[in-house]
């Protein structure tokens, strides 16, 4: 077969791509750092995070009480609060400073504050206030204290309304306290828990972040082992852009295709989270999401000079990226600039699409905007990766030629000296 023929070039390109794939795959499993980020973290971290929030709610949350009123009304509020299943009045303090110290020592997760004029204002028919102070480092305890306080306050408000209305029958009292009756029926997040609300988004974000960390660390290792500190080595197998890009991309796509199915199908089932995922939908959805993450990571790998750099570039972005998806913060309250900035990252559309698939049973046609956006990102980042690798390949060849010329000059100089 002639070397100039098209068939020979195609076969040679496929052979080189397989060689690059084999080399990159071997490096992934030999490099401890890359192995941790690409294999161990996606396997273990979701289990730990899901286990923490598996209970969905917490019970008997320790709470301090600062009662400066010492009245019948404040004691009634505290008694009802302590009788609830979610919270418990553990400490009674004489000042705010004493309660703050308990929160600082993690003895309690919050405290209730009753001012001295609490009962006086109620008896005058004025609006009274109860201060609710919560430690927001754990959302489950914050939710338990805050919602229990609201429920008790609503119950006491109803009692005051009944007293002031002067109704004659129980039906009159019902109409006074609840003129419009309604039943709250959760449709998607049936447990109303934190895990079902946030965990699907976190699982999808883990895919992107661990992939970026693994690709970045592998790129840093390649530069450190390269004599010219270049991302792409000078070799006969690394002679074309497409074979390099496809060879490297195939490695991470194969690894994260398995991890993606594990995170989206296995983990929710293990912890009994709401999951309405179907095989066909999730396979069609993960294909553009994983590809866009792979090409996005390969494009950014040119910025990594040392292995440690990737930690600075990726790790701190996890929480902001989760906020910008509109999952833990209302999308309507996010400025337009940051909404546009979030479109750069595949996780934005990946999280929004997967939440609809997992919690609402959506099909690919129901998430068409996110599905199209992921394919657009795949195409854009693929072209950007090819351009970046082309520049890196040129730079590597240029430095290799310069190094060869310098070596020849040194050899000639040594021969002159010896003669």
Where does each model-flagged region fall?
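Hydrophobic alpha-helical transmembrane segments of multi-pass membrane transport proteins
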Residues: 44-47, 185-268
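Loop-to-transmembrane-helix entry motif
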Residues: 28-35, 206, 247-253, 257, ...
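Membrane-spanning alpha-helical segments of multipass transporters and channels
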Residues: 48-49, 91, 101, 254, ...
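Alpha-helical membrane-protein architecture signal
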Residues: 14, 18-22, 196, 237-238, ...
């Amino acid at each position: 077969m002639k070397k100039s023929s098209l068939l020979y070039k195609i076969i040679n390109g496929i052979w080189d791509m397989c060689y690059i794939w084999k080399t990159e795959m071997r490096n992934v499993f030999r490099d401890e750092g890359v192995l941790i980020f690409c294999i161990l973290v996606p396997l273990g971290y979701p289990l730990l995070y899901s286990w923490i929030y598996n209970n969905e709610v917490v019970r008997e949350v320790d709470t301090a009480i600062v009662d400066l009123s010492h009245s019948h009304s404040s004691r009634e509020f505290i008694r009802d609060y302590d009788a609830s299943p979610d919270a418990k009045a553990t400490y009674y303090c004489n000042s705010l400073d004493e309660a703050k110290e308990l929160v600082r020592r993690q003895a309690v997760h919050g405290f209730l504050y009753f001012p001295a004029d609490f009962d006086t204002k109620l008896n005058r028919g004025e609006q009274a206030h109860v201060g609710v102070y919560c430690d927001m480092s754990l959302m489950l305890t914050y939710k338990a204290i805050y919602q229990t306080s609201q429920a008790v306050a609503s119950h006491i408000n109803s009692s005051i309304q009944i007293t002031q209305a002067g109704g004659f029958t129980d039906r009159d009292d019902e109409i006074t306290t609840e003129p419009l009756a309604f039943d709250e029926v959760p449709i998607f997040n049936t447990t109303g828990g934190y895990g079902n609300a946030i965990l699907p988004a976190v699982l999808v974000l883990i895919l992107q972040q661990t992939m970026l960390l693994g690709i970045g660390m592998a790129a840093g290792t390649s530069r450190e082992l390269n004599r010219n500190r270049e991302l792409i080595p000078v070799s006969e197998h690394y002679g074309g852009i497409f074979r390099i890009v496809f060879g490297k991309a195939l490695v991470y796509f194969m690894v994260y295709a398995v991890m993606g199915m594990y995170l989206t199908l296995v983990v929710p089932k293990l912890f009994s989270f709401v999951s309405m995922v179907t095989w066909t939908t999730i396979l069609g959805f993960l294909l553009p999401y994983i590809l866009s993450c792979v090409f996005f990571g390969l494009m950014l790998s040119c910025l990594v000079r040392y292995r440690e750099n990737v930690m600075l570039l990726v790790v701190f972005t996890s929480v902001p990226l989760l906020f910008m998806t509109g999952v833990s913060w209302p999308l309507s309250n996010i400025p337009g600039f940051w909404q546009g900035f979030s479109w750069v990252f595949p996780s934005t559309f990946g999280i929004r699409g997967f939440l609809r698939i997992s919690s609402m049973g959506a099909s690919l046609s129901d998430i068409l905007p996110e599905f199209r956006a992921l394919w657009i990102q795949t195409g854009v980042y693929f072209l950007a990766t090819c351009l970046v690798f082309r520049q890196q390949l040129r730079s590597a060849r240029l430095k290799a030629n310069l190094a060869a010329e310098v070596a020849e000059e040194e050899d000639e100089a040594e021969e002159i000296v010896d003669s």
